Amino acid sequence: MKIMIACGLVAAALFTLTSGQSLAADAPFEGRKKCSSCHKAQAQSWKDTAHAKAMESLKPNVKKEAKQKAKLDPAKDYTQDKDCVGCHVDGFGQKGGYTIESPKPMLTGVGCESCHGPGRNFRGDHRKSGQAFEKSGKKTPRKDLAKKGQDFHFEERCSACHLNYEGSPWKGAKAPYTPFTPEVDAKYTFKFDEMVKEVKAMHEHYKLEGVFEGEPKFKFHDEFQASAKPAKKGK
C-alpha cells in the first residue's frame, strides 16, 4: 500500500471522535507495550507495516522525491516538527502521548492506540473481559468498552491524517493541513473502505474467541474474521 504519511496534523482532531469520544479525549495513552503483552501475534505482524515505520519518512533525506513533490525540504529533520509528528506517532499532544522532547519507543509509529483509542480507561476492563471468558465463557458487551473509550470503528481516526488537506471531502479537515494530497500525487487518494483492507498497512487478523458481543461492531468485522488466521494464543 502506498501509505500517505501526512504532515500538518492538528493532533487533537484524532481524539474527539466516535463512540466514547469524550472519555477517549481525556484518557491517557499507555503505549503499545501494554496491548502487545496479550496481543503478541498482532503486535509482531504490525512491525512490518508502513504504520510501524511511519517516523522513518520524517528523517532527513528519506522519501526525498515525495517531499520534493509536496514542496518540503528533503534535507530537513521533520521528526522535530510539531506539525508533522502527530501523524507518525501515538498520542502527540495528548495525555501520556508521544513528545518531541522525550520520545518513547512504545509510542513511536502509528500503533494500537492511534486506531483503537487511548487505552488507560478501557484496557483493564478489556483484559478482565478476556479472563472472565476463559473462566466461565461469559461474554462482554462491546458497548461497555466503547463507554470507556475503546474505538470499534476507526474511520474518523484514519481520516484525521489521511484526509486532512484543503478541499478534503472529510468535514473535519482544518489547518495546519497535510501537503500530501491527491493533487500532488494520486497515490494519496484515501478511501477508507479500500485502504482498511490493505494487508501491507494493517496487522494480521487472527480468529477471535468471542469475548465481546453486540454493537458497536466494526463494519468489516465479520468479513475479516472469515479470512482470519488461526489464533496464536499466548504467542
Curated annotation (Swiss-Prot):
GO terms for cellular component: periplasmic space. This is Cytochrome c-554. Heme 2 binds at residues 84, 87-88. The keyword Electron transport applies. The keyword Lyase does not apply. Keywords: Electron transport, Heme, Iron, Metal-binding, Periplasm, Signal, Transport. It comes from Nitrosomonas europaea (strain ATCC 19718 / CIP 103999 / KCTC 2705 / NBRC 14298). Residues 1-24 form the signal peptide.
